[in-house]
């Protein structure tokens, strides 16, 4: 696949409380801000929030399935968690090619997640080894 600066792909998914609970169970991160509504109501957010890494994992889905696609290998990722994600939020994860290292099969991509109000919740940069396909 020939990649060019500016190429973009995205996915959209609603983060459900069941996703948050499953992520907590898989990772062992049972911070009550994510899984205990009574506790979460006492925090600055006033309700449960999704794990930042759960939301960021949508970026991995875009990279693996769309751009660059199959066989791609994550080499690195920077992330800034800009705003909370709440169960029920619709998140769009978008990646945009910003650099192509010809001959090395490596690309850099801007990574941004936004909510249904078009507010940025995560931003960062990924470095990816492009797959054989």
Where are these regions (language model features)?
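Proline-rich low-complexity regions
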Residues: 32, 68, 84, 130-131
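Hydrophobic beta-strand-centered segment that forms part of the acyl-chain substrate-binding groove
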Residues: 42-50, 57-94
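Catalytic strand-loop segment that frames the active site of acyl-thioester-processing enzymes
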Residues: 1-50, 132
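Short, intrinsically disordered, mixed-charge
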Residues: 25-29, 64-68, 116
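HotDog/MaoC-like acyl-thioester-processing domains
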Residues: 1-5, 85-133
């Amino acid at each position: 696949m020939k990649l060019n600066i500016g190429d973009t792909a995205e996915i959209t998914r609603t983060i459900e409380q069941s996703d948050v609970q499953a992520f907590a169970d898989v990772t062992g991160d049972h911070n009550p801000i994510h899984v205990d509504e009574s506790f979460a109501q006492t925090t600055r957010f006033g309700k449960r929030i999704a794990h930042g890494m759960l939301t960021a994992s949508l970026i991995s889905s875009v990279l693996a399935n769309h751009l660059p696609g199959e066989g791609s290998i994550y080499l690195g990722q920077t992330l800034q968690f800009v705003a909370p994600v709440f169960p029920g939020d619709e998140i769009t994860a978008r990646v945009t090619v910003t650099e192509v290292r010809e001959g090395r099969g490596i690309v850099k991509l801007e990574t941004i997640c936004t909510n249904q109000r078009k507010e940025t919740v995560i931003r960062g940069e990924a470095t990816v080894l492009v797959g054989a396909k």
